């Protein structure tokens, strides 16, 4: 819907009535306009009638405008509660529309858009099927891609074939077809979204004189495409989200003399009123993880946002998904009104279109596997196919009939037409093109093109109208409305709104950095102004500069979180992506300034860095500048990549390179010539140099240790002793700071401000890259629906299709072959299975007076209110109700799946209480199709069968049963297909079938629950699913199924109905009856209006009880049920079931138990069907398979290990045993530890994927134990850790040359083997540590942040940056607790102990002995006490002394001793065991429900079953507390 002035001229609104109580302002009714105007409620009328009516309205409005009968100023200066107040119950949309039309007359005619298309051919490049990538075959993919690149070979895939059509301004087109037929591609092509799809040169499109190139560029935003997914900033309120859209497209000169901001606010209020979301003004939008508005309301926010874009041509792709049919009809009616009075053209794809919605449209296009089989008036379509020879059942709606034609199993030829009707898509298309209707269409297209020549009069008017709305500061061909500065300002305001809405990350980072500053400040507390602090000052500044630099690394994740939203807004022409980039960077500046001040103040003055104003402010300046530079660098990486994985992989290596070549770990003098360029390109290096110069320049430091010193040297004076520090001069008691950094680091004071200038240059360079990349590089193209198979298992039929280049695109639809009729014919060879294989059930499940109470925000709320019912074998029972009635909650309560709150009432199986085995004996098909994406269909079914069927059944029998279920569900054609993700894997229907299959193969002994099995499916697929359920019930399956607004044909498939009103109150429980007559009779006799002939009973019932939008009922239907004789009969039947079945069940049970051994009886009632050892074996195999089939995980792990090890190894290549060489070897171990964080973050997402599946589906169904889940995930990581350890060992140990240190000791092999074991322990510790941290935490991101904090602590206190001798006493416990202490101790002592030191020339200290003494005589006492050696023992002047002779002396400075090697190795095993035990313990504490699920034996009526809050995990607590709102849909 386009709204006046936002896009162009005139908008039409319905009134929203707000109600009290639970609905609180949800649209209860949209009152019809008071004027008599038939088009509001009747089906779409003829074009002639509508043209007359619009002309009449225009003349009437013009007369009113001239005569001034209705003051248009009242539009914006209305009184509260008047008929122009959008928040008022009296809001009159028609009057508002008339006034807005008058007000906008002054700005010229409204823009209108229509289009014609001839020979529309669209293709992509891809295939219909692909093979699954694994660790083993991934290299082959690279070779194949290289071959294709060299040969320029692309596989062209045709999506749309030769389509024709015309859509005049003010007309509405509905596009019908099953998923994969090309509906999405058609809409995207019309709207100009050509990302990954291509238009053939022969295709012709004409947008009323505007070319496709102009629509896609200059007029982007005038034709928009709205996808079915809802992408919004979750923490912004609905009001903020829609205000932004309204302001972004507000015209330059709003009517009524008001400001743009006031105008945008008014438009927002009106559009919210129209879509019934005024009550959500201050509610956050939310998403799948953040609670906000309900799913249906979020969908309406998406629709409202697109409406505010004001495009004259709008394409809506399944935008009614998630809305019930009543709201879907309202949406279509609103589009109809816009089309009639403004001239908006709409093209809408709807999967389950109610008849009333279909009647709103002028034209329909029917697609069948990429072929157009009809395009014309909606009133002509049905007759066209009936004349062709097809039968339309009387109870079938026209849209369902048209969609059914694309399914061979659903379409029915009329008598006498068998064999004469078309059967393939190509035959249908050929028949269409031979028809008279097609010739009429071609004539209409020709007329349209003659009327609107390219760049004719209409184009000029369109251009003028658009230009009048744009800012004067915009170039003529800009698609945007606001100037660039205006866009930045708008995005900046939104940025601060987002910050205020969710400051948690910012505050957490501020607090975390403050804590880190305190810790580091205390470690290096009050450094003395002596030479003993030189190393510590360097280490401190190194750590400080890294904290400033890498504080922005998380910005990669933040940018990817908002990328989809920014790209959507760019398509709507709200703003330049680069404007949002500028605003985003500016929004972060206040945080960065505050963080810099807090961090600098704390660290700088605690550690006694140079306490002078100039140096302090320079320290802050460099820290802040470097923070900004690195922020832009990370943002550039995110913007240059198309997926998060592409961004994170180079970022990890880049961070390592930047740290290595800062100048501390490897100083400039020791950098290899071939790697020196990395230092020149490293921004951190320039910052570090400036901070070192800032600290050391022009300062004299007292010498803390002279050589020689001690007994016998008390009288040494002048040049007879020298300070033991680089830069010292013999005889001087102080060391000049400049001399020290010149000699040790090659840093010079002249570089101080030069480096600042270089940092500014880096900032400008990265900012330019960031803004350019943001503007031009879009996210990864979405792949089409293609099936994926393990290598060697792709069916021949699909291989043949791929070869012939017909199928899907990279972009959207490939499901047309993946599940299409052609494939089914060619691949399916097996006969259909008989549903008789389903285990026939005999138990009756009944419930009585079920009540469920929970607390929300400490307020008690009743979700279910005394609900009664039963499910008998061989019956299909529907559970229906309004949104929020508690349908899903009732299923969860009955299936024992709620984990908090209080449940009361009776739930009996054959009159007896449910036992601990109840959950595994029932099947629960959830609404979300959750499966492990790396498994194949057959493997997913086998996994469920092996673990959930009785352990007494052999594996062979279980596998045979799986094959039967595959046939029954008609899944054998894709039994070997990989589940994958939507788009690359199974399509929606196939996933739903698999979800049902997983529960069926478990042989549920009691019943099957299904939650919304048809949600999001097209009508054809929904029908197939219902037929399948019907087939199951005919063979004894008991089924209870929630369903949302079924069509009349679907509704007839159910035997019984349980209908709930809001608050979980029963409205009806009983039989439906043939033609729904029992149900209809009940409601009619209790006061409902008569059900019209041919009406959908489900929709009639909702309207009759006042549950549909626009409906009202004076009857209290819950009370009517309570007082009804039908309820009395239900209660009588429940008592009978309990009495008769209870006795029978007990007797049958005892007989059955007598026939079985004790162990068999125990197994029958056990919590799990399989023993623990079997669970471990099966689950471990699946986890291992998941790793093997996720090559991105294993190869990125291997790449990180190999490349990091090689990078470190060759940066410290062949490090010698000079003092600097030893320091290099120390830092080579330290730098190897820095990959710990990245390795941890690679492990966590894989674990959370498995955990989500386990906790949502497998744990509630008692598939296997939580202990098995944790242990199998840990064990599966160990082999990969060992393999990666070997990779690191060979690429790191040998290049550095550690093995050469062992040659003098004769223990080369022993020490090499010991180093190998230590590296393995490092990686095993890493794997177990990662799982321990993530075990109890909801998201991998949060766990990653905690792991990084702990890792940083371990790194600081391991004894490298701050040797134990310099640590304050209260931090010594951290030194002893840190596992890295023992790793450093073991690895470094194994690497360099027991070897001689050979000083380099610059490390030699020069002094003169007393006259008459040789150097050897003078220094002998000192050497015997403290070690070291003389180069020239016999000299009498200029003694050259090296302060170390053995590497053991160097190691002793860091408290490292070779004798501890086996102690350290044993302690590391202790840490690993601790991690495993802690992982199990933390998971149990945080995420395992503590209620065991056992129930008391039958007690008198009213017994309470208390379900204590079972989990401390916030996520679980929230999901249960949502029972009343979102899950109770």
Swiss-Prot record:
Reactions the enzyme catalyzes: itraconazole(in) + ATP + H2O = itraconazole(out) + ADP + phosphate + H(+); voriconazole(in) + ATP + H2O = voriconazole(out) + ADP + phosphate + H(+); fluconazole(in) + ATP + H2O = fluconazole(out) + ADP + phosphate + H(+)
Residue positions with a glycan: 235, 318, 742, 1434
GO molecular function: ABC-type transporter activity; ATP binding; ATP hydrolysis activity
Biased composition (Gly residues): 1-10
Annotated stretches, region: Disordered: 1-21, 1493-1529
SUPFAM superfamilies the UniProt entry points to: P-loop containing nucleoside triphosphate hydrolases (SSF52540)
Keywords assigned: ATP-binding, Cell membrane, Glycoprotein, Membrane, Nucleotide-binding, Repeat, Transmembrane, Transmembrane helix, Transport
Transmembrane segments: 505-525, 539-559, 589-609, 614-634, 648-668, 757-777, 1193-1213, 1227-1247, 1268-1288, 1314-1334, 1353-1373, 1465-1485
Disruption phenotype: Does not affect the susceptibility to azoles. Causes further increase in susceptibility toward fluconazole and itraconazole, when AFR1 and MDR1 are also deleted.
Domain annotation ABC transporter: ranges: 144-394, 845-1087
Protein name: ABC multidrug transporter AFR2
